[in-house]
């Protein structure tokens, strides 16, 4: 069960620290990978997708695959375009919060991109550029997960993707299903990916 798996991870970590030897541990469990490893090698169809520390993998994913595989819930992916200076949602609303250097690296003007946003990097903000409607609330004690869908075509809404947008909120903040909320992006915490290749725009 879950408690047994948690205890096993702790025991494996203790064993690794006590032996002080290089160990290779193969797992499909991202929590095991993040908590046990000093370095992670992410494989996709037998090919190396990314190699780095757990922080590297989580904070600077090299591709959409890595971004959505590592981390629970998976990273949100929002379609946008860029003119090389700013990110623009489908209704023309600018999306702030992504580092200017990442936007410039997205290359050609008016290029289609995917903006990756971790659920903890989306903030409730009455002036936010992303407008969504709350579908489901998961109350997890210290945290609340809000599963939302985009409101397309409205001022300040602009996200046309139909997949869920997941927002992590403090446990005491619980909007009701059906509520319309606005979100902004934590400064410099967005990621820009090429939708054709799936690679981070580097």
Residue ranges and their predicted role:
Residues 60-83:
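C-terminal boundary and immediately downstream tail of ABC-type ATPase nucleotide-binding domains
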Residues 39, 57, 72, 137-140:
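Beta-strand-rich soluble domains of envelope-associated proteins
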Residues 7, 60, 68-69, 125, ...:
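Residues that scaffold the ATP/ADP-binding catalytic core of kinase and kinase-like folds
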Residues 75-77, 86-202:
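Non-catalytic connector elements of ABC transporters
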Residues 1-65:
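ABC ATPase nucleotide-binding domains
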Residues 53, 65, 79-81, 131-135:
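Residues located in well-ordered beta-strands
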Residues 55, 64-68, 111, 120:
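Internal, well-ordered alpha-helical scaffold/interface segments
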